[in-house]
A protein has these predicted regions:
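Helix-turn-helix DNA-binding segment
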Residues: 72-113
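Basic, Lys/Arg-enriched C-terminal extension of HTH/homeodomain DNA-binding domains
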Residues: 119-172
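N-terminal regulatory/sensing modules of transcriptional regulators
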Residues: 1-69
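A broadly tuned preference for mixed-charge, low-complexity surface segments
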Residues: 50-61, 78-84, 140-148
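Residues within the DNA-recognition helix of helix-turn-helix
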Residues: 60, 113-116
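Charged, solvent-exposed alpha-helical segments that act as regulatory interaction surfaces
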Residues: 67-74, 123
Length: 172
């Protein structure tokens, strides 16, 4: 199954439905994904670089199907909750300094969490904005692969983080 849709919400809804069907391999081509990135694999979802030429795209799919591709495999079970939550806070629009002040921790601790997450996800060498977008996509794929109860828990967690950031901005 190959999914290449510009709208992120629509892409994630379709991806969630496709993942329920137990498809062998899913190839995802996100819109705002750099063309120089490697191929990433999380569960049975392969994330390929954006705007590949057709023959290169077909070769990539063939090599992934035959397990010959140099794919960065991601095991989200090895990622701590604090690393995911730091990423979610930063994706909500708060800066490192503001988040450190809000959580009463140091900026160095937060940067360490983000760097550890980037290393575990194979996103070393990219700017922070790109790393956060990629981490968010990996987090969404991770949550889509969970049962409905856990998925609802993760959605509530995201909403709670967003609300706490909004409340903090209202106070400050």
């Amino acid at each position: 199954m190959i999914i290449s849709i510009a709208n992120k919400d629509v892409m994630l809804k379709i991806l969630g439905e496709v993942m329920k069907m137990n498809v062998l391999k899913i190839f995802l081509e996100p819109l705002h994904w750099p063309s120089r990135m490697n191929v990433f694999k999380m569960h049975n979802v392969y994330i390929v670089p954006y705007r590949m030429k057709l023959n290169q795209f077909i070769e990539t799919i063939e090599s992934c199907m035959l397990a010959l591709a140099s794919v960065i495999s991601i095991n989200p079970e090895k990622i701590r909750g604090s690393e995911w939550s730091t990423m979610l806070y930063l994706m909500s629009g708060i800066s490192n300094r503001q988040l450190a002040y809000m959580l009463k921790t140091s900026e160095k601790t937060l940067s360490g969490r983000v760097n550890n997450l980037a290393i575990k996800l194979g996103l070393v060498g990219f700017n922070k904005a790109l790393q956060l977008r990629a981490m968010n996509l990996f987090y969404l794929i991770y949550t889509l692969n969970k049962p409905a109860e856990k998925r609802n828990y993760f959605m509530k967690q995201q909403k709670a983080i967003l609300e706490s950031v909004k409340k903090w901005f209202a106070i400050v």
